[in-house]
């Protein structure tokens, strides 16, 4: 069993989508189920409706899964496991106040040392714990031996005992901390491999420590993906528009192209343009670079254009707001100068929009409009053009410039003859 575990606290980040895609691919390769675990334990940060938005995006990208679960539904199991750790003396109640702990952190900061909890409550006698009426958290005891992770991407990572203190696993309100809930849920779901971002590397030894303390012996494999950098070489954040999957979709990037690009970067694929289903045949975690991947919007545009080219005319037509294959053919022509469905929509919209004719050509344009409205049907552009020239007496730029604007909505663009054969049935709507 593999899992994708997003939090419903904001728009889906491309890094999270990349994690979801990789989990999906590997689950198919291993013939194992994929579970979606909505990590909703941080009630203050949860945003209503974001869980549905996450699932809608996964469905849009063709990422199927066996079940959706909510971490908050497992609170009773988290509390039971915490009680077991307390009974086994693998955890202890901590009565240290927030003010006291903040003071200790400040002291560590001033002395330029890493803060580690000093185990002040680790050895309290049972009678003191029972009689104490102050609020408490639950901490798991720090490790005595090194914790070693064999990562599919990063190789061996070793954490010494001093790297991890006795950290909190249950809050004062009896809700689990992230690492505890995550470790317990991975046990409950029988997870075999965890694929996630490298920002979770420091969480992994803590989760291993929790499972070992609970007597869970199954080895869970790990693969931590390098972060994605922006143009400035910094980690992509919410300030970067392109970090939001929602933004990319609204800008007209196809799900298939976004997936293609996220698999492509920092990887060694056998070809540049492919689908997720094709990637299942050759994808390997071991081929993912250990170094951060840089996000290149121009490369994404290139990949997106190639995926748009693959679409048949009817399907492309739907992406630009029509249902006629002929409009899809026009969109294909405009792919010479456009890379997204948003750009294509704008190009097609100009054809059907009210035309903005320069003053010097308005009179000529009016003449052409009247002729077109009464003209017979012409299969070929040359016949259409010659008829208007003959009827209007116009020539040169006084003919071609207003005609182009009337038919295309712009003074520049593809060859009129190429476009005409696909819009000839719409002339009455185009030239109003």
From Swiss-Prot:
It is an enzyme of class 6 (ligase). Its main location: cytoplasm. It is found in: Cytoplasm. InterPro entries: aa-tRNA-synth_I_cd-bd (IPR045462), aa-tRNA-synth_I_codon-bd_sub2 (IPR020751), aa-tRNA-synth_I_CS (IPR001412), aa_tRNA-synth_I_cd-bd_sf (IPR008925), Glu-tRNA-ligase_bac/mito (IPR004527), Glu/Gln-tRNA-synth (IPR000924), Glu/Gln-tRNA-synth_Ib_cat-dom (IPR020058), GluQ/Sye (IPR049940). A motif ('KMSKS' region) lies at residues 235-239. It comes from the Bacteria. One of its GO terms (cellular component) is cytosol. ATP binds at residue 238. It catalyses: tRNA(Glu) + L-glutamate + ATP = L-glutamyl-tRNA(Glu) + AMP + diphosphate. Its EC number is 6.1.1.17. Keywords: Aminoacyl-tRNA synthetase, ATP-binding, Cytoplasm, Ligase, Nucleotide-binding, Protein biosynthesis. One of its GO terms (biological process) is glutamyl-tRNA aminoacylation. GO terms for molecular function: ATP binding; glutamate-tRNA ligase activity; tRNA binding. A motif ('HIGH' region) lies at residues 6-16. Catalyzes the attachment of glutamate to tRNA(Glu) in a two-step reaction: glutamate is first activated by ATP to form Glu-AMP and then transferred to the acceptor end of tRNA(Glu). This is Glutamate--tRNA ligase 2. It comes from Sulfurimonas denitrificans (strain ATCC 33889 / DSM 1251). The gene is gltX2.
């Amino acid at each position: 069993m593999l899992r994708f575990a997003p939090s419903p606290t904001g728009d889906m980040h491309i890094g999270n989508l990349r994690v979801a895609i990789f989990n999906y691919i590997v689950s198919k390769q291993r013939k194992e189920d994929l579970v979606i675990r909505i990590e909703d334990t941080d009630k203050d940060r949860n945003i209503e409706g974001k869980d549905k938005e996450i699932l809608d995006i996964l469905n849009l990208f063709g990422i199927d899964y066996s079940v959706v679960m909510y971490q908050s539904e497992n609170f009773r199991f988290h509390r039971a496991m915490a009680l077991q750790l307390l009974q086994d003396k693998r955890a202890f109640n901590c009565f240290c106040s927030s003010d006291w702990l903040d003071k200790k952190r400040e002291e560590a900061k001033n002395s330029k040392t890493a803060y580690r909890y000093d185990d002040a409550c680790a050895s309290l006698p049972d009678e003191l714990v029972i009689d104490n009426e102050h609020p408490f958290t639950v901490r798991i005891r720090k490790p005595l031996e090194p914790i070693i992770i064999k990562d599919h991407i990063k190789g061996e990572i070793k954490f010494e005992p001093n790297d991890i203190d006795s950290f909190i696993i249950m809050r004062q309100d009896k809700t689990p901390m992230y690492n505890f809930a995550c470790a317990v849920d991975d046990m409950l779901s029988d997870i075999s491999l965890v694929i996630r971002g490298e920002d979770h590397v420091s969480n992994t030894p803590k989760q291993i420590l929790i499972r070992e303390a609970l007597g869970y012996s199954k080895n869970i494999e790990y693969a931590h993906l390098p972060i994605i950098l922006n143009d400035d070489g910094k980690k992509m954040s919410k300030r970067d528009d392109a970090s939001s999957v929602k933004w990319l979709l609204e800008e007209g990037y196809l799900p298939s192209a976004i997936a293609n690009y996220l698999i492509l970067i920092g990887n060694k694929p056998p070809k540049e343009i492919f689908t997720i289903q094709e990637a299942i045949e050759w994808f390997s975690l071991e081929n993912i670079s250990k170094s951060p991947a840089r996000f290149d919007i121009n490369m994404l545009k290139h990949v997106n254009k190639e995926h748009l080219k693959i679409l048949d005319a009817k399907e492309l037509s739907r992406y630009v707001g029509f249902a006629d294959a002929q409009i899809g053919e026009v969109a294909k022509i405009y792919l010479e100068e456009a890379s997204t469905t948003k750009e294509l929509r704008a190009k097609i919209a100009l054809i059907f929009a009210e035309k903005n004719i320069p003053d010097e050509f308005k009179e000529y344009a009016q003449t052409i409009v009247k002729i077109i409205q009464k003209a017979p049907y012409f299969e070929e552009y040359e016949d259409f053009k010659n008829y208007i020239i003959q009827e209007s007496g116009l020539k040169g730029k006084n003919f071609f410039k207003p005609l182009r604007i009337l038919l295309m909505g712009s003074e520049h663009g593809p060859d009129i003859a190429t476009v005409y054969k696909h819009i000839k049935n719409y002339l009455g709507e185009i030239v109003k």
